[in-house]
Amino acid sequence: LCEKIDVNIEDISIGMGLDKRIGGRFLRAGPAYGGSCFPKDTKAIVTTAAKFKTNLSIIKSVINSNKNRSSLLLKRVLKILNGKVKNKKICFLGVTFKANTDDMRDSSCLTMIPSLIKKGALINYFEPTGKKEEFKKLVNVSFSKNINTAIKNSDLIIIHTEWNDFKSINFKKIVKNKRFKIFDMRNIYSAKKMYKQKINYYAIGG
């Protein structure tokens, strides 16, 4: 909704977090949730409720919303690239479902990357944990051993995971393609600073 009406989700999160009944700790915009807990636990709760003929409509809607999140992000990527994906060099920085883990279970990139490949994109990624087993069988996917190599020839750089390693990258110095774009799925950068550097920057919810 914020993207539709040109409102910054970070401002909304700060405002909501001021309510002590809500708090701001978990109000972070981003891709779909994943890992070993949320996906399994939400489904287990719904299944248990069904056995006792109880309809947990809110939790069901959360599960469905999370399923749709990756497809919405994919549409955003297509929009950023003006629908021209074939032969575009797209770099994913981070592929785990969150930072400080090597867990890729239900990571949104597991849906996005194969979809982009089908559309002809050339995918490259860097993952601080060195994780690459999931993509070994995919064509047009390469793994870089460092950030500089990963991003230097990119048309689009996607910040998929909020690793601290990614927060101080000098994109202007490293990326050769002067018309490169950044899609920050974790909002780890200041949009104002990016615009000041004349970088084509796109964030979640803004």
Residue ranges and their predicted role:
Residues 1-206:
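Structural/interface elements that position substrates and couple domains in central-metabolism enzymes
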